[in-house]
């Protein structure tokens, strides 16, 4: 396929146009008075959403050079979403402002590399300042406030706050679809750990990129599983039982893995393979915990249990298993209450006698996993479209709440960024030339999220930004009430992790665009003589 190349200014201009198109589509959703965007899907009904990353994912531009810019900004949104689960619109708006101001300076002769370095230094300084100014979050009420801001729904906020307090900060909160119209919270016995599926082919729900197994069997295996003849006899028995299978082992590889994958693709046997978490003795101990929770046995040749000889009797069970790329949650395992209580007692006794802090901490983590259970938020709605949107909102809210517990919160509404600008003063005195210019570019971009929150609320963005920059540190503009004041008191707060990710990711993408000298794209395949192409219509008949 032949390529098409653009250089310097032309390349950067086209990329900027793409950045603008994507950011303009997303930024109308910013803030409590943000609007919705309707996405027409190639199949199924249209989706209505106000979630930045969902909109960004749908956008592909016709002009290949503009599309490069759009895809770069899309990566800002997705990165921020992966780390913090929220803040994608803020990140997109920041990136747009940085690209705009940065390109103006490059066009005027600034050195893009130095400019980019200045932007990066400024981003780090602001990120540090945000972290330093964060307030820790502990109680259900403030966790609930974070979730309310994220989902724009007080009921959801309360449920998430309650869920997080019930299962503890290490506990697992999952989101399911409810069969009724109500959204409610259920706390069940369950256990989660930080290992996801070994292969993406195991995904069963493509929207959420998760593998969901209902009423599943669970195989726990101490060592690696690689040979197919070892696994096959058991697989055949599981297939006869007609139930999905979760495999937790040191690793699953080779023929064994490819057979599972082929079965998953053909849908002949629903199975998901996951690596057991931790190493060495901790891994052994955790597998034993899982055996207690699921009511199964760990298959281990050392105790005479050999994979190719065992039957269904060694398998545990679970009402539901949800696996994504980073984590596995087992809900309602088949282990008896007595066995689980016995195991907890044993762990507590070990904690008592342990003389090493590290061991004690790890034992306490295991106990928390066993005792914590899993909070399931069941989301209900009247229509399919509504359900999708609500479920997405609840998932974002849970992610935001977790981020808040991890690193604390800062004031929301774009105000924290405006106030964090003061952290750039020390850089201003030590940098010079185009690096200093980069810091100024960054300083000017910091107010862009607040500008759009105010604009979406129907006010003059510049006036609001000006006013907020004169307020003391904890104060800002509340776009829901259209008043200025103490935002933490009003519950207008963001997890600092979200705000920091937005700052860092926006800066890294802006640097990429600014330092682009050449853009190479596939030449679009064209119908004969329709006069498109990058020259934009040469045929003036």
From Swiss-Prot:
Reactions accelerated catalytically: ATP + H2O + a folded polypeptide = ADP + phosphate + an unfolded polypeptide
Keyword Isomerase: yes
Recorded superkingdom: Bacteria
Main localization of the protein described in the UniProt heading: cytoplasm
Biased composition (Basic and acidic residues): 523-533
Cellular location(s): Cytoplasm
Binding site for ATP: 29-32, 86-90, 413, 478-480, 494
Swiss-Prot/TrEMBL keywords: ATP-binding, Chaperone, Cytoplasm, Isomerase, Nucleotide-binding
InterPro entries: Chaperonin_Cpn60_CS, Cpn60/GroEL, Cpn60/GroEL/TCP-1, GroEL-like_apical_dom_sf, GROEL-like_equatorial_sf, TCP-1-like_intermed_sf
Cellular compartments per GO CC: cytoplasm
Protein name stated in the entry: Chaperonin GroEL 1
Gene symbol of the encoding locus: groEL1
